[in-house]
């Protein structure tokens, strides 16, 4: 079901589970909230027994499926406003504990969200560890800096070893923050969340989502 958050940002939500184990906010990839994420919200709510909400990363903008204008729009995004939307999505779930999971650009925002105590556990799928040069702006702070200021130990990073957005030196820097890193040796960027991508690897994707579920649910057994 689509809703509008208090900020005016669109989101997709499923709170149909009677007694959810926790809440889960999803930060989509650069191609925005779309049927892929509507389906993911419903599926994870059902299969993971969670209340789930995915948030539009480009609120109030009309961007087509072409990637070029989306890349061009990223520098105008504001970290504080994006985190506000993630918090509002968490509030909409009505659960005591809330986790965060994101993909690609959304995975980058997962790293940045380590500064927020609102999320008990975080899982970043192939998020950019350093902001690409074309995305840099005064409103985009470096993920590594925010991880250093926040709680990197609550973050799980799912990384493809052949992903050009997460080169080995960046992954080493990510590990140095205390972030928990799982690498898939043959995987490229975007290998897990969209089965239509050429880079999709079904076995690695299944393993990554299993690890992520276990990681997120670990928050429900940890001390507050």
Report each predicted region and the residues it spans:
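Serine-hydrolase catalytic machinery in alpha/beta-hydrolase-like enzymes
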Residues: 1-95, 191-193
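Conserved serine/cysteine hydrolase catalytic core
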Residues: 136-153, 210, 214-216, 221-224
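Conserved alpha/beta-hydrolase "acid-adjacent" motif
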Residues: 164-173
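C-terminal catalytic histidine-bearing segment of alpha/beta-hydrolase fold enzymes
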Residues: 176-224
